[in-house]
Design a protein with these regions (language model features):
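Ligand/substrate-recognition segments at binding pockets and active sites
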Residues: 19-28, 33-39, 51-57, 407-469
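Detector for C-terminal structural segments
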Residues: 58, 364, 368-405, 425-433, ...
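Aromatic- and charge-enriched surface segment that lines or borders ligand/interaction sites
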Residues: 18-22, 41-43, 140-142, 147, ...
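Ligand-site clamp/hinge motif
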Residues: 289-332
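A bilobed periplasmic-binding-protein/Venus flytrap-type ligand-binding module shared by bacterial periplasmic
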Residues: 285-288, 339-364, 368, 377, ...
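N-terminal lobe/hinge region of extracytoplasmic solute-binding protein
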Residues: 125-176
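Surface-exposed binding/hinge segments that line
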Residues: 214-260, 267-281
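A structural "hinge/loop" feature
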Residues: 130-144, 240-246, 539-558
Length: 563
C-alpha cells in the first residue's frame, strides 16, 4: 500500500478509538477503514510489521481481538516522511506530511550533511532560495555560476588554486595567427543523455556567444576536422583561452533550445547531471561517463529551506548569502573555513539617469555615502563580518588615493530610485542605510526589490543600483570581464555616445589596459562606489574531506568525499 494511504488508515483507526487499547473485531475495523475483511487483515499485518500497532487476533468470526496503538499519528507521519526522504522519495514524503513544507524542513535538519544511501556517498546541503536557472550564458547569480561548472564543461577551465587556465574538453590549443586559434577536442565526450559530443555542438556553442559583449569579437568558428575547431577573431585577444573558461562559454548541445525545461534541467557533459530541480531541492548525481576523473561524491542534494532562515537569528539570516553550510546543526566536530571575499558590495550611479549625468553630483553622492559613514547605519549583527571597502578588492585602495574637494548637493528637492536584486537578505539593510544617509542631505530615496535578470540588465530606469560581486582567482581577467561584460555596469558606467566601453575593451584585449588601471578609471568617474567586503564562510563537519573554499563561496563537488 502507498505510504500515505497506510498512514491515513492508521490515523483513522487511532482517531476512532482515541488511541486507546481496545477489544474489537476485524469486521468493525474493516467498516471503519471502508474496506473488506481480507484487505483489513493485510493492512493490520503491514502496520504490525512496521511496529505501528499490536494486533492479537482471536480465532473465529465472532471472537474479539485486542488492538494496541504503539505510536501517535503525528510521530508516525514524521518517521514515515523521514524514511522516504532517506530513500530520496521527496514528493512522497511531502504527501505524507500533507504538503507541509515547514514540517519537511524540520525533518531535513536531522538529515543534512554527509550520509550513505544505497551504498552511495550523499551530501545534503541547505540553501535559502530556489535555483531555477542553470543555463550558461544567461544572467546567473554567484551560486548558479558555481553550479553550472559542476554540470557543464567548457573548452578550457580555470584552476582556482593556481589561477591558471587548464585543459577541459579541449586537450590542447595554440594560436595559429594573430587572429586565429585552434582547439583540439577530446574524443568520446558524452552528454548526460548518453549522446556523444560532436564538433557541431562545440561550434554552435561558440557562435551563440557572439551576442555577449565579451565574445562580440568572434568572427567565425569552423570545424577543421571532427576533433579540431578554428576560432577567427575580429581583433587580437591574447586572453582567449581564459575567456573560454568563463561560465558563459560552457558547452551546450546543439538542440538545447528545443527543450523548454533546459534552464532548470540542463543537459551538460560535466561531472554531475541534474536529476531533479524544483522549489524543494536540486538533486545532482555523479556522471559515470564523465571524461575526467569520476566524482567521489555520488550525489549532491541541495535543499531549498527558506523556512530555516525564519527560525534562525537575524545574524544568521543576514549572512546566509555568503555562507554554505554542509550541516547547519551545530556539533563539536564542525569547523569553519573563512576567507575574505575577492569582491564587494557596491552602489552604481547610472550615468544614463537625468540627474546623475552630472559627475559633480555623483561625486557628492559618493562622499555622502562614504563606506565609513554608511556602515554606522547598519545593525552590528548584519555587518559583523564586513570591512569598509577602498576599491573592488580588499587589497586595493583606489578610493583613498582620491583627494578631490567636494561640496554638497544644492538645496532643493532631489528624489532618486534605488534598485537591488530580490531574495538576498543583506540588501534591505544596506538600502535602508543609504536612505538614512541621503535623507540627512534632504535627498529622498525610494527603494525597489527587482528580479536579478532585470537588475543585471539595468532595466526599470532606476538612478542607483545596489549589488555585490565576487571575482575568481585570475583578477586581470575577472574584473575587466565584469566591468565590460555585465550589461548593467557597461551601460551605466561608460559613455555610450563616445563608444568608451568598446575602446577600453579593445585596449584590455590587446594587453594595454589591466584590471587595476581600469578599476581606477571607473572609480574616478564616480559611477561605481565600493562599499564593503564580506567574508566567505564554509561550515564543514569533521567527516568531510577536501572541501576547499573557492572564490564563489562554494567548493568543488567532484573532489570532496567523506570517510
Amino acid at each position: 500500500m502507498h505510504p500515505k494511504r497506510l498512514t491515513q488508515q492508521y490515523h483513522r483507526l487511532y482517531q476512532h478509538f482515541s488511541g486507546q487499547e481496545v477489544d474489537t473485531q476485524l469486521q468493525q475495523l474493516a467498516d471503519i477503514a471502508c474496506c473488506t475483511r481480507r484487505h483489513m487483515r493485510n493492512v493490520l499485518n503491514g502496520m504490525q510489521q512496521l511496529g505501528w500497532l499490536k494486533w492479537q487476533a482471536q480465532a473465529g468470526r465472532g471472537g474479539r481481538s485486542r488492538l494496541r496503538f504503539c505510536c501517535k499519528p503525528e510521530s508516525l507521519r514524521r518517521d514515515s516522511a523521514a524514511s522516504l526522504l532517506g530513500q530520496g522519495k521527496v514528493e512522497q514524503a511531502l504527501e505524507v506530511l500533507d504538503h507541509d513544507k515547514q514540517a519537511l524542513a524540520t525533518i531535513l535538519l536531522q538529515q543534512l550533511g554527509q550520509h550513505w544511501r544505497n551504498n552511495r556517498q550523499v551530501l545534503s546541503i541547505p540553501y535559502y532560495r530556489a535555483l531555477p536557472s542553470l543555463y550558461p550564458g544567461t544572467d546567473l547569480r554567484r551560486s548558479e555560476r558555481h553550479l553550472v561548472r559542476q554540470i557543464h564543461s567548457g573548452l578550457t577551465v580555470m584552476n582556482e588554486e593556481k589561477g591558471e587556465v587548464e585543459a577541459d574538453v579541449a586537450h590542447h590549443w595554440h594560436q595559429h595567427s594573430s587572429l586565429e586559434w585552434h582547439f583540439h577536442l577530446r574524443p568520446c565526450v558524452r552528454w548526460h543523455d548518453g549522446r556523444l559530443l560532436s564538433v557541431d555542438d562545440v561550434k554552435d556553442s561558440l557562435l551563440r556567444l557572439r551576442q555577449l559583449p565579451l565574445f562580440s569579437h568572434i568572427r567565425t568558428v569552423q570545424a577543421l576536422t571532427p576533433r579540431c575547431i578554428s576560432i577567427v577573431l575580429n581583433e587580437e585577444d591574447a586572453r582567449l583561452p581564459t575567456l573560454l573558461a568563463d561560465s558563459a562559454a560552457l558547452l551546450l548541445p546543439s538542440n538545447h533550445a528545443q527543450n523548454p525545461e533546459f534552464a532548470s534541467h540542463p543537459i551538460g557533459c560535466g561531472p554531475y547531471k541534474v536529476m531533479a530541480n524544483d522549489d524543494l531541492h536540486l538533486s545532482l548525481q555523479a556522471f559515470d561517463d564523465y571524461f575526467g576523473y569520476r566524482a567521489l561524491l555520488d550525489e549532491i542534494d541541495i535543499w531549498i529551506l527558506p523556512e530555516l532562515g525564519v527560525e534562525q537569528s537575524s545574524e544568521q539570516q543576514s549572512t546566509k548569502g555568503l555562507e554554505v553550510q554542509v550541516s547547519p546543526v551545530a556539533s563539536a566536530e564542525q569547523a569553519y573555513a573563512i576567507e575574505a571575499e575577492q569582491g564587494c558590495y557596491f552602489v552604481l550611479f547610472d550615468s544614463r539617469s537625468a540627474p546623475l549625468r552630472s559627475q559633480v553630483l555623483r561625486q557628492q553622492l559618493s562622499h555622502l555615502l562614504s563606506p565609513l559613514l554608511l556602515i554606522q547605519h547598519i545593525p552590528l549583527d548584519v555587518r559583523q563580518y564586513w570591512t569598509v571597502a577602498s576599491s573592488l578588492l580588499p587589497q586595493w585602495f583606489h578610493l583613498r588615493q582620491q583627494h578631490e574637494v567636494v561640496g554638497v548637493p544644492a538645496h532643493g528637492t532631489l528624489s532618486l530610485n534605488l534598485a537591488f536584486p530580490e531574495d538576498q537578505p543583506d540588501y534591505p539593510a544596506i538600502a535602508q542605510a543609504i536612505q538614512d544617509c541621503l535623507a540627512a542631505a534632504q535627498i529622498e530615496v525610494s527603494c525597489h526589490s527587482i528580479s536579478f535578470t532585470d537588475w543585471q540588465q539595468g532595466l526599470g530606469g532606476f538612478d542607483m543600483y545596489l549589488g555585490s560581486v565576487n571575482f575568481t582567482s585570475d583578477i586581470d581577467y575577472a574584473i575587466p570581464a565584469w566591468l565590460l561584460g555585465t550589461p548593467l555596469v557597461r551601460n551605466a558606467a561608460f559613455d555610450a555616445h563616445n563608444h568608451q566601453a568598446t575602446d577600453l575593451h579593445s585596449e584590455w584585449r590587446r594587453g594595454v589596459l589591466d584590471a587595476g588601471n581600469l578599476t581606477a578609471y571607473v572609480l574616478s568617474q564616480h559611477t561605481l562606489l565600493p562599499l564593503f567586503h564580506n567574508r566567505l564562510r564554509l561550515q564543514v563537519s569533521d567527516g568531510m574531506q577536501d572541501l576547499k573554499l573557492n572564490a564563489l563561496g562554494w567548493f568543488d563537488f567532484k573532489s570532496a568525499w567523506h570517510r
